[in-house]
Amino acid sequence: MKEQFVAKRIVNIGLIFLVAIGVSVIAGMMGRMYLDQLLGMGALTVLFMVLFAFLLIYERKRKKISNNRETDYGKILKGFLLSAILTVIFLFLPEFTSPVMILPILMSAVGTYELAVCSSFFFCTVLEMAKGCQSYEILCCTMLLLAGFMITHMLEDTRNKMWYLILIFAVAVLIPVLFSYFFYQEPHYDILGKAAIGAAVTDLASAFVYPFLTKQKEAEIDNFLTDITEEDYGLLRELKKFSRQEY
């Protein structure tokens, strides 16, 4: 059967593209970048989004997004927009205190592991470029993302969820504190307190937002199974044309 081109799917990819451009422009302006730097960040964003769009299409064709080849990327758009909003909020936070571990956790709830990895690193790249961060904060951000990627799959194990939430809190506090010590060569207790607040927010998102988004993703599967039984469903019409017996 032929590939179905769905207008809503194209619109949602376009909106994801606009969100990426928007967060890059906002971050660049808040970081007081020069015009040439803004243009450079815009070019990087366009390059990333072209690759991200192809990855979306590839993951959809493999039925990796909600086990649904006919997904319209609506859940991906919501997760991407939420991640962009969080990235803008992180711009106001002091160094070493941005709870970026929340990004892969949220994106994996609405999409796939691959999409979570790519989008999270994109948002962190925009964040660090806008803040003009030094190498230790970039490494701190990277370590938090890696921790988020590793913990994401564990959250599906509801029986041991409390232990994973404790682990998330500990990691989200210790990594910023350690990297800030490497940079300043002395302890900063204000960073400890702010990192603890960020860790608590990450825990809350893992405990409540992650399962909520996961249930929405599962509901998309149920809606898909209902839709394919309808007479006006596109692929069902194609099957009817192709083989009356199979229909």
What positions do the PLM features span?
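Hydrophobic transmembrane alpha-helices
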Residues: 31, 37-109
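Hydrophobic membrane-spanning alpha-helices of multi-pass integral membrane proteins
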Residues: 12-25, 78-84, 141-148, 164-180
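Membrane-helix interface and helix-disruption motif detector
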Residues: 29-42, 90-98, 129-138, 158-162, ...
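Hydrophobic alpha-helical transmembrane segments
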Residues: 14, 42, 76-81, 102, ...
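Interfacial aromatic-anchored transmembrane helix boundaries in multi-pass membrane proteins
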Residues: 124-152
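Generic transmembrane alpha-helix motif of multi-pass integral membrane proteins
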Residues: 100-116, 150-155
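N-terminal membrane topogenic signal
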Residues: 2-17, 72-76
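Acidic/His-rich, divalent-metal-binding segments that scaffold phosphate/diphosphate chemistry
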Residues: 120-122, 166-247
